Amino acid sequence: MAIALSGDHPFENTPSLEAKALRINLNDNIYGTFAEIGAGQEVARHFFRCGGASGTIAKTMSAYDKDFSDAIYGREDDSRYVSESRLNKMLDWEMGLLEKRIDRTKNKDKLFFTYANTVTTIDFAKKFKGHGWMGIQFQTKPNEPYSTITTHVRFRENDTKSQQLSLGVMGVNLIYGAFYQNDRPKKLLQYLFDHIDRDSMEIDTINFTGPLFEDIDNRVLSLELVRLGMTDAVMFGPDGNNLLPARELYKKNIIA
């Protein structure tokens, strides 16, 4: 137990990025896949570089080419690749493969997860800074139904490399938060920006679903994004789930 001295004030000690990835890797039961398409090719490497990944990473998928991505996950009705629909297809498809290929009778204690992202970074003309969807489907007890966290981010940095690096850090924070902060979703939101400059990215949509989050009101978390300065505006639907404002208001007439 750490020594406490008179006059001390409580504070939270933020684990380093390497410590977060290593804690995941050193857990005997956490086991899953990474699927990253488009420009978001940075998350899995943190888990490889910190060591101990052989018992954690079942597979990494990098489907950069659009035709190859369509061949795996199917073509979207709107032909978009950076979308919530594509992200959910990736999560479901990769989890299905994991369940199919890993014998549960031989791996009774395994906690399966799938992390996925689909991202576009800043364009050559630097007019469109880029955005992306990322998410994780996971369980904290063997054979329990999966819970899911999905989020949409917008980049504010002005070069591709910086955007990719920031996304990689946030991906590690999301995976770590899913397993070790799922009982405190509001805190989990804050931890997504560990080791990231708040001005580098914006989170404008996040949804928590599944058995771990049955008592969570996503509308409250949506407002928390605004309170924390992670975004300027949020939107949610009648079902209580958060919506992407840019998508819902695209080409719509608005009266304010």
Predicted regions located by residue number:
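Non-catalytic terminal extensions that flank enzyme cores
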Residues: 2-255
